[in-house]
Each structure stands twice: as C-alpha cells, then as structure tokens.
UniProtKB/Swiss-Prot annotation:
Entry protein name: Putative ankyrin repeat domain-containing protein 26-like protein
SUPFAM superfamilies: Ankyrin repeat
Region (Disordered), start-end ranges: 222-242, 268-321
SMART domains: ANK
Keywords: ANK repeat, Repeat
Polar residues bias spans: 229-242
Residue spans of the ANK repeats: 48-78, 82-111, 115-144, 148-177, 181-210
Presence of the UniProt keyword Nucleus in the record: no
Gene: ANKRD26P1
Signal peptide: none
Amino acid sequence: MRRSSGFGGQKGQGPSCSFTGCWCCRGDDVAESDDSPFAQCGYNIQEKHLGKLHRAASRGEVSKVECILSSGSADLDERDKKKRTALHLACANGHPEVVALLVDRGCQLDVFDNKNRTALLKAVQCQEEECATILLEHGADPDLPDVYGNTTLHYAIYNEDIPMTKKLLLHHANIESANKDELTPFLLAVHEQKQQMEDFLRKQKENLTAVKLESIHQVMSEYKENETPRNPQNSNPEGTSNKMACLGEGAAGAKVDEIPGNPVKRLFNKPSIDDSRPMSANEDFDFDTEEKATEPANGKRQNGMGIIESAPQEHTNNENI
C-alpha cells in the first residue's frame, strides 16, 4: 500500500505565502509537481495566467467580481488552463464574500479542476470552513472524490479539523468512502496516527450505529404491528358460519354420507360384497386381496385362493386313513 504522506499548513496556508494571504504565487512547478495528495492545500498561481474574473476572485475583490459579472465580459463558470473556476480560487484563498456572490449568481458548484477536485473539496483542504459552509448549504456534494479517491472527509481528517468534520457529517458525508489506497476516513486517521481524529470518528461511528439500530427496531416494530393476524373468528365470518351450519346438521342426526365432499366418507366408504355397483377387474382384484384375511378357513372360492383355503381339509382326511 502506498503511504499517503504529505504536509499540511496552517489555515489557508502552506509552507510559505506571499499572495493575499495564500502561499500560491511561487510558480506552477513548485508544489503541484509533487504527486502526494496531501502535499499542498492551496493553488500555485501566476497572475499572468489568470483572466480578470479569476484574478479578482483569487484576491477577494467582491465589487470587481460583481462588476465583471454584471458587464457580461466573463463567463461565470469560465475555466483557466488548469480547469479551475473563479469559485475554486475564492474557496482556496478563503474569500467567503466572493463565494457567496458567485453562488447567488448561479455558478456550478461541483465543477472539477485538473485533479478532479471541487471547490468544496478545496475549501475543506485549505480549512476554509466559512466557504465550505456556504457551498454545503447550497447543495454541494461532499462525497465527490479527487484523482486519489479522497473525499472532503479524508482531507478534514488529515487536517485534524474536527469542526469541519462535524459539519460534513451533518451534511451526510459518507464516512465509509474509501480512497484508492482502500482507506476510509477512519482508517486514514489510524494510518496517519491522527489519534484525536481516530477517537472522534470512533465515537461518531458508535453514535451512527446506535441511530441505525434504533431505526431498525422502529421499522421492525411497525412491520410486526402491521403483520399481526386478526382474530381468527372474525377473519372469515362467511366461512365460519358455513362450518357452524354443517356442524349443526351433524348434531341433528345427518348421516356422514350426506355431507358433500366429506373426507371421512372418501376414506372409509369401501365396496362391500353386497354392493350392487358394477366393479371393474382391478377393483375386484383389490377387493379380494383386502378381504382374504377375513375369509372363513373352509370357504370355497373359484379362484387361486381356493387352493390354499382347502388345504386344511385334505390334511384331515390323510390323518383318518
């Protein structure tokens, strides 16, 4: 497993900073050449590469941003050469007033930069909670992963940012989302030895499990209540009355034969010797077989059974001789 190592800076900063409160003006080839997901928080920016809207947004110049948008001289969701929007730069540099303006103007919230990071993810990564809050309250998705598979929760955990983590969880961020190293936010905390975050997440998972169990119990209770059988005496009143009528007839002396479809009749109504109903050959054979145990020993029969039946008399005559 590749270790996702890196270094974080203070809020809104990396190792150094010389551009309006951010460390992002040292050249595009400095930190972004490091492929580690946690090697940098902000953007490396050269002003000459920015359009006027991006430049004003990255500096936090609210009135200038509004003027540019009102004049129609720039597209609200315009991208720079690294696919960043003005919203990305405002979030990374911590300008909530610009973020609010762009959102009110209807900008797209979940646009990806060249590393598949949304403006919300950049706000979380750079620990800009106010910017992140605006985006979350307007429906930004906290679970969209970047090229490393990390979501907003992974970066909040790595930064040991408990307030941001709480806010993300309140907006239903997925605590079980795994990155490309197969690390969930909790496993990332363990892997990076973030003990405070590990304890916090363990507590959150316990609370989440308790809530889930309570919901399951409630659902099961409602299911059992809906599936409880009604009183059998009332479940089929018509069928019950018919059964009672049959029982009443039996009590009044009705013959068993008179009850239609009576199973007792089917089981015990065997044909007798005096039965005048014509019998098939198979029925006659079955009858003889069943009755042989009850035939008298001296009874003569016109079939093979008669030979066995007359044997005792022949034996008696031999004794007399």
